[in-house]
A protein has these predicted regions:
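Active-site-proximal beta-alpha core segment in soluble small-molecule metabolic enzymes
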Residues: 2-135, 149
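Hydrophobic side chains within alpha-helical segments
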Residues: 38, 116, 141, 154-157
């Protein structure tokens, strides 16, 4: 995309091996950072290249894939680890995000995830770090839950004219 002249911000939500740190810096691509060991690996790559990698901290509030765990049992530890990660040399922690696992289905579960996300943001803030960008709204949440917009939304499939769930009423 960069070689084609695209200058808009690019955020990789998946995992990029840390040895591609130079490319992340060269092309000014923001990388999701899902745990402290990955943050340390990205930091080492950035330092060895003499640059800075921009990251968004990924929080697992209930999707159970990648991210700092944000359930009640792990909230305090994750807040401490996130705070350590954002202070590593060579990293610029611009944002923090989570992903809703069922925002086109369960309002109760989506709101539980949203509240966990707000809790981790607050705990990290209490430890002295505030993120410029907070985001969690995927396609379904963009359509159904305006309260979850925060600083940015991530519509995906709706950009192609499809609804996240075939049973959703488009309301048109």
């Amino acid at each position: 995309l960069r070689e084609a002249g695209i200058q808009a911000p690019i955020l990789i939500l998946g995992c990029t091996p840390s040895f591609y740190g130079k490319e992340l810096m060269q092309y000014n691509i923001t990388q999701a950072c899902y745990d402290l060991s990955y943050a340390k690996a990205l930091s080492a790559e950035a330092q060895s290249a003499g640059g800075t990698i921009t990251v968004h901290i990924q929080c697992d509030t209930g999707m159970t894939r990648l991210g700092f765990l944000c359930d009640e049992a792990h909230m305090t530890q994750s807040a401490q680890e996130i705070t350590e990660a954002v202070r590593l040399p060579g990293l610029h922690a611009e944002g923090i995000f989570t992903h809703f696992s069922d925002s086109d289905g369960s309002e109760e579960y989506t709101m539980m995830q949203f509240n966990r996300f707000l809790d981790i943001i607050q705990k990290v803030k209490e430890l002295g770090y505030e993120f410029a960008i907070r985001h969690c709204a995927n396609s379904a949440a963009t359509l159904l839950y305006p309260a979850t917009y925060l600083d940015m939304v991530r519509p995906g499939i709706v950009l192609y004219g499809h609804f996240p769930d075939r049973t959703m009423d488009p309301g048109l």
